[in-house]
């Protein structure tokens, strides 16, 4: 079996039918012409935000990470492992792709510990066991994995989806693409940066060009490139016609170098 490709989905993608249609059409085309196994890892911040708004609950972030109090983890689990995950499975079904919905704790695929007490139920993901997901891939299934994990003590944790995808890529020896709303990392003039090293990222963070959630994304990608020992791509789902090329290894966004 070829080494798998993990596609991490994020941003408002889950809110846009047009975007999901484009993405799944690209996935179908890619799967028809390549034997390479694919895995989707997703967050769903927009789904969570919408739910929190309906429930009149505050959304608090610290350094770009969502603070998850004990009384909110059940709601966030429902939004990510429930609504967001099943929405993606429904789209896969519509496109005749045999898929299976999972969370990080299934088959101990990704191990999770609490990241920081101040953040509450927010987890740090580390590589786990490849057994379950490899079994599914060998059976021709598309695993769709939410970024909810569980600690050894049985505590549910909300994990940053970029970081969850990195840990799963390390578990499986997979390549990783981080798909988001932006077409890559932009410089101070709004131009896409084709390649990024750790030194360059540090410089842009110091200059205030990379800020907030993008710092988390860039650090996750740098961490992924270092952990995996290979480049990681940050790209946009908006250019559907370019996605098959991206899945084939052609950079269309920003390539993060190890």
Swiss-Prot record:
CDD domains: AAK_NAGK-NC (cd04249). It comes from Citrobacter koseri (strain ATCC BAA-895 / CDC 4225-83 / SGSC4696). The lineage of its organism: Bacteria, Pseudomonadati, Pseudomonadota, Gammaproteobacteria, Enterobacterales. It catalyses: N-acetyl-L-glutamate + ATP = N-acetyl-L-glutamyl 5-phosphate + ADP. The record marks 8, 217 as: Transition state stabilizer. Belongs to the acetylglutamate kinase family. ArgB subfamily. The gene is argB. NCBIfam families: argB. Transmembrane segments: none annotated. ATP binds at residues 181-186, 209-211. Substrate binds at residues 44-45, 66, 158. Pathway: Amino-acid biosynthesis; L-arginine biosynthesis; N(2)-acetyl-L-ornithine from L-glutamate: step 2/4. InterPro entries: AceGlu_kinase-like_sf (IPR036393), AcgluKinase_fam (IPR004662), ArgB (IPR037528), Asp/Glu/Uridylate_kinase (IPR001048), NAGK-NC (IPR041731). Homodimer. GO terms for molecular function: acetylglutamate kinase activity; ATP binding. This is Acetylglutamate kinase. Keywords: Amino-acid biosynthesis, Arginine biosynthesis, ATP-binding, Cytoplasm, Kinase, Nucleotide-binding, Transferase. GO terms for biological process: arginine biosynthetic process via ornithine; L-arginine biosynthetic process. GO terms for cellular component: cytoplasm. Catalyzes the ATP-dependent phosphorylation of N-acetyl-L-glutamate.
